[in-house]
């Protein structure tokens, strides 16, 4: 099918800790890489010990908004990047990431990449928006 990743615990579909563990096991049994969303610094800490490839830090209050996590929570991104790195995980950040500058700031703060949705889907030219964000990550 070409499926390579499983995105778990997004703020629009939060699941219990037991469901997270079961979902990770199910994904791993299918050789999928796992992206586990964390809504807080505490969750980043807790989830970094699990068998996942990526932790995606996305504060729910910023999702779909005009304020980027990269500019509003730089200290948490730095700390989350350190926690992830110490545990062999890569950090993604999302929430309000809409511009090349937002994406570049996330990487400079220690993130390996970004999660985007409304910033691309709702753009006048989604392809151009996506290309601009990708340019910042290369």
Go through each PLM region and give its residues.
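Glycine-rich phosphate-binding active-site loops on the catalytic face of alpha/beta enzymes
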Residues: 1-17, 55-67, 109-130
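Alpha-helix-loop-beta-strand connector modules within alpha/beta enzyme cores
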Residues: 20-41, 71-91, 133-138
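Short, glycine/charged-enriched secondary-structure capping and boundary segments
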Residues: 20-23, 49-52, 69-72, 106-109, ...
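Conserved N-terminal beta1-alpha1 strand-loop-helix module at the mouth
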Residues: 34, 42-52, 121-122, 126-131
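Catalytic cores of alpha/beta
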Residues: 36-51, 93-114
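Metal-centered catalytic cores of metalloenzymes
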Residues: 42, 75, 84-89, 104, ...
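Catalytic-face loop-and-helix region of soluble metabolic enzyme cores
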Residues: 59-62, 81, 89-96
């Amino acid at each position: 099918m070409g499926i390579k990743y499983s995105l778990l615990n997004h703020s629009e579909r939060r699941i219990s800790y037991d469901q997270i563990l079961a979902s990770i096991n199910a994904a791993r049994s299918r050789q999928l890489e796992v992206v586990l969303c964390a809504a807080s610094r505490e969750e980043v800490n807790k989830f970094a010990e699990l068998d996942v490839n990526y932790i995606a830090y996305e504060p729910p209050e910023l999702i779909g908004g005009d304020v980027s996590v990269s500019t509003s929570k730089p200290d948490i991104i730095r700390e989350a990047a350190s926690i992830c790195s110490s545990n062999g995980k890569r950090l993604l950040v999302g929430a309000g990431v809409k511009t090349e500058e937002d994406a570049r700031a996330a990487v400079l703060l220690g993130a390996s990449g970004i999660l985007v949705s409304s910033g691309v889907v709702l753009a006048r030219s989604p392809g151009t928006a996506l290309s601009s964000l990708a340019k910042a990550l290369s």
